[in-house]
């Protein structure tokens, strides 16, 4: 639809948060990927939101049961003051675990399990912002290098969660 390939790429990037690939954001962007039909489908599915949240909560409880026993895998604390939607299940991979977050991600991918690195790279490391902020952010850097979000959705089977946790526990 565009005769100018460079402009087409820029428009695509801007409508997808400026994301070029899993670890590089080239320019500021927004989330503009939904068309009218997709918006309609979203509206029609709103009646299922609470059911999905409840299903995800049960899956998170199962993850927490297994992962709480693994040294070097830190879980975010539960808080009764926060109502969660369980959209993500982040873990923090510490040095005590014996491998880095990146090594663990590769290991899971070898088993066809695709976790996501969240908060990575730091915004200050994005190509479009690099060099604009001069302060030190050690807490943000620590989290950016260690957070991994494990697969979570209401329909994930318990056996799949158990397999993921077994892979994390075995460290092979």
Tell where the protein language model's regions lie, with residue ranges.
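PLP-dependent aminotransferase class I/II
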Residues: 3-172
